[in-house]
Amino acid sequence: MCDDDVAALVIDNGSGMVKAGFAGDDAPRAVFPSIVGRPRHQGVMVGMGQKDSYVGDEAQSKRGILTLKYPIEHGIVTNWDDMEKIWHHTFYNELRVAPEEHPVLLTEAPLNPKANREKMTQIMFETFNSPAMYVAIQAVLSLYASGRTTGIVFDSGDGVSHTVPIYEGYALPHAILRLDLAGRDLTDYLMKILTERGYSFTTTAEREIVRDIKEKLCYVALDFEQEMQTAASSSSLEKSYELPDGQVITIGNERFRAPEALFQPPFLGMESAGIHETCYNSIMKCDVDIRKDLYANCVLSGGSTMFPGIADRMQKEITALAPPTMKIKIIAPPERKYSVWIGGSILASLSTFQQMWISKQEYDESGPSIVHRKCF
């Protein structure tokens, strides 16, 4: 099990993207959408080699004729058959490895249902015959990647956001807050406000176009009201985007109105605190002695923290909530899109971690519930 020549696999299963690769690498080898697509129409061409399902980039490129489904919603696997397809694709098509030869480190969202990690464990050992596996919490890995052991991680991906306070390497579960508001909701909101401008995006395939618009053109305003006035009085904030059919659309205040929903969830009709307030509430649930260390180490991670301007806005909002003399530092590493994966790569290659793996033998003796005893 502890042979040095067998690299562990690290798979970060996000709601939007799967990041996969080998422990010890500095970036994931394979990054592809967590999508399974099935044809919407009957195949008429014989010998075309049509498949009954497509995964990842192939599903994305054929999206015009497919119905796209995401098996992971809000960080929780809702469709295990599709999830198995995605893992199969990861091992055999993307990484080209035999899963029975490599230990595998999987990631999961904090506060996930226990049954979820048991099922993950079961599939790895029984379907893919993994020699060993481990399930790690995403936010903790992001903190590893930033080179810290204490801090509060705001992790926001496509399906779910969390604030996770971590002290000396331990996540503090009573203070973890979860917000079901993330990239996919922002994409849907952008679809809605673009419709108000007269552009119609409705299908699952068109949603992917809007996601691309969001990733390329959106940003977070430092002062929302001020920015709205600027947008109304001049066209300096307008940008154009070319759709796949060559039509060009113009997008103005939508560029910062969409990500603003992170700070003002009522925009989406959600009655919850914004991300700045959620971070603050999370810190306030911690012991008074460690709050200073958390304020000074607010780490952003995940794809939905990639909007330009988000770190400055967080700094401004948290400063307004915190005690006046408190030193507040927002850490936004440039590679934060992949920091969960990078943290997993670091963890799985530590020599001290090697006794933490759940081995096939232990699984055979104890069954899926072993995961709660060995992974925390």
From Swiss-Prot:
Family in the record: Belongs to the actin family.
CDD domains: ASKHA_NBD_actin
Reaction equations catalysed: ATP + H2O = ADP + phosphate + H(+)
Keywords: Acetylation, ATP-binding, Cytoplasm, Cytoskeleton, Hydrolase, Nucleotide-binding
Organism: Mesocentrotus franciscanus (Giant red sea urchin)
Protein's name according to its UniProt entry: Actin-15A
EC number of this enzyme: 3.6.4.-
Residue numbers covered by the propeptide annotation in the UniProt entry: 1-2
GO molecular function list: ATP binding; hydrolase activity
Alphabetized PANTHER family for the sequence: ACTIN
Enzyme type, top EC level: hydrolase
InterPro entries membership: Actin, Actin/actin-like_CS, Actin_CS, ATPase_NBD
Subcellular localization, as worded in the UniProt entry: Cytoplasm, Cytoskeleton
GO cellular component, as recorded: cytoplasm; cytoskeleton
Function: Actins are highly conserved proteins that are involved in various types of cell motility and are ubiquitously expressed in all eukaryotic cells.
Modified residue annotations for N-acetylaspartate: 3
Matches recorded under SUPFAM superfamilies: Actin-like ATPase domain
